[in-house]
Design a protein with these regions (language model features):
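Radical SAM enzyme core and accessory elements
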Residues: 1-105, 109-113, 117, 397, ...
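Short beta-strand motif preference
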Residues: 46-48, 157, 269
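N-terminal [4Fe-4S]-dependent radical SAM core
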Residues: 88-95, 112-156, 204
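Canonical Radical SAM [4Fe-4S] cluster-binding loop centered on the CxxxCxxC motif
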Residues: 150-187
Length: 465
């Protein structure tokens, strides 16, 4: 079914997200003349018109601030469009009318406001029982870590560099061989920005709760450059220090020792798959044996280890994915994260027009991973969703008891301010009592980042003061 949506509101992009979630059963066609959905908003009323039928619903927003009124009207418009498409296609989506990244954040907010969040998700947002149960379980598992504290901050350092580009990746990451002339200046500037941020922490009188070094692949750096950044961060006192070591072909014993000597508590070793044919296909320059070798080497140190896998990688069958899940479980890391492939703009898979919407396969893969991982002593502790995901499902992080990642919970629930360093890094300032946050983004390109050092430091200082 081809469809066109017309609205008098500013919510068209959000409404398009609902339509895309029903792909391939529904497709957007701006030239469509027959199947046109009109969504009109007039004060507190949302009207949906389709095939000479009109449905109107009022939104109780009179006593809400303007930004909240807008949010509630948008939510109602999405629900009404979802109901129409569900009726036309006979399909119900795993998370109902929800299209946002952070369903657990909304669940927490509703609970904290005194509402029955689970009932709201099921009855109003049209989330099926299984989806509502899953969100509730994750929120319950965050107890003891989930908190609001404006006197604590997280640190994030971005190393947007990789040895090569994976076919599914859309991050603004540079290939190591193409930016060698900028490496030393970049490392130096990141170290200076970290020092500036530590001074800012002291001025603000706050504590650092966790540190997360991501990218890209931070371990793409040589040992000398890598140590400069990790050693500077190692001077900071915090509860948790994670490095996204990532690709096995970038991890050496010396880098593991650098991390251990400087207080890193948690690393990621990310296979994505344990199938050699897929590793080659997606542009990973290592084999499954390399994964095993690096994992055993990392176990000589006292790190908690996370392993990422991706469901619906190109040409992978259910049995291929099952094999990867079983291999990860057998290695017995503290965390396993299951991503559902999202075809993102800027990725090679998007350019190749790879189809990740094979009927029922994503659901089968994710259901298996849930059951297998949980039955082996893990619990889901955070989740997030993205556009263009296979099966409109989710990414879920699992942890053994008392091994959940603080930073992952903080960033997904947006409960703590984040001081971010490096090209493309985004700082966040959270005002818990006002339920408000603001963002400050560093320039994405390494070259631009290097050109604007003084402005970056000044902007950050003004942002947090």
């Amino acid at each position: 079914m081809e469809l066109k949506v017309v609205t008098n509101s500013e919510f068209l992009p959000d409404l398009m997200d609902v339509v895309r979630a029903f792909s391939p059963l529904v497709a957007i066609d701006e030239n469509e003349q027959k199947n046109i959905v009109y969504i009109e908003i007039d004060n507190d009323t949302v009207a949906l018109k389709f095939n000479q039928k009109t449905i109107e619903n009022r939104c109780e927003i009179q006593n809400l601030p303007p930004i909240k009124q807008k949010s509630e009207l948008k939510r109602l418009a999405k629900i009404m469009l979802y109901d129409l498409l569900a009726e036309c296609t006979g399909k119900r989506l795993p998370y109902g009318s929800l299209t946002g990244i952070r369903p657990t954040k909304l669940y927490h907010e509703l609970t904290e406001s005194g509402k029955d969040a689970k009932n709201y998700f099921k009855e109003y947002l049209r989330v099926p029982q299984q989806g509502a149960d899953w969100i509730e379980r994750i929120c319950d598992n965050q107890k003891g870590i989930y908190s609001h504290n404006d006197k604590q901050v997280d640190f994030f350092v971005n190393i947007p560099i990789c040895v090569s580009r994976c076919s599914y990746c859309s991050f603004i990451s540079a290939e190591l061989g193409k930016i060698k002339k900028w490496l030393a200046p970049y490392v130096g500037q990141v170290v200076r920005e970290i020092k500036h941020s530590v001074a800012l922490v002291e001025i603000l009188g706050v504590q650092v709760r966790s540190i997360y070094v991501g990218g890209g692949t931070p371990t793409s750096l040589c040992e000398k450059d890598f140590e400069q950044i990790i050693a500077e961060l190692g001077k900071i006192k915090c509860k948790e220090f994670t490095v996204e070591a990532g690709r096995p072909d970038t991890i050496s014993k010396e880098k593991l020792k650098i991390m251990s000597d400087n207080g890193v508590t948690r690393i990621s070793i990310n296979p994505q798959t344990f199938n050699d044919k897929t590793l080659a296909l997606i542009g990973r320059n290592h084999t499954k044996q390399d994964i095993f070798k690096v994992y055993d080497m990392a176990r000589e140190f006292d790190f908690d280890i996370n392993m990422d896998l991706i469901a619906m990688l190109p040409n992978e069958s259910f049995e291929d994915f099952k094999y990867s899940v079983d291999q990860a479980i057998a290695l017995n890391p503290e965390n396993i994260t299951i991503h559902t492939l999202a075809i993102k703009k800027g990725s090679n898979l998007k350019l190749q027009e790879y189809d990740n919407k094979i009927e029922l396969l994503p659901e089968k893969m994710i259901e298996y991973s849930r059951n297998a991982i949980i039955s082996n002593g893990f619990e889901p502790y955070y989740m997030y969703r993205q556009k263009y995901m296979s099966g409109n499902l989710e990414n879920t992080g699992y942890a053994k008891q008392n091994k959940a990642c603080i930073y992952n919970i903080d960033i997904m629930e947006e409960t703590h301010s984040i001081i971010a360093c490096g090209a493309g890094a985004i700082s966040k300032r959270v005002w818990s009592e006002q339920n408000r946050l603001e963002r400050l983004a560093n320039p994405k390109g390494i070259d631009v980042y290097l050109e604007r050092e003084e402005k970056i430091l000044a902007d950050k200082e003004n942002f947090f003061k």
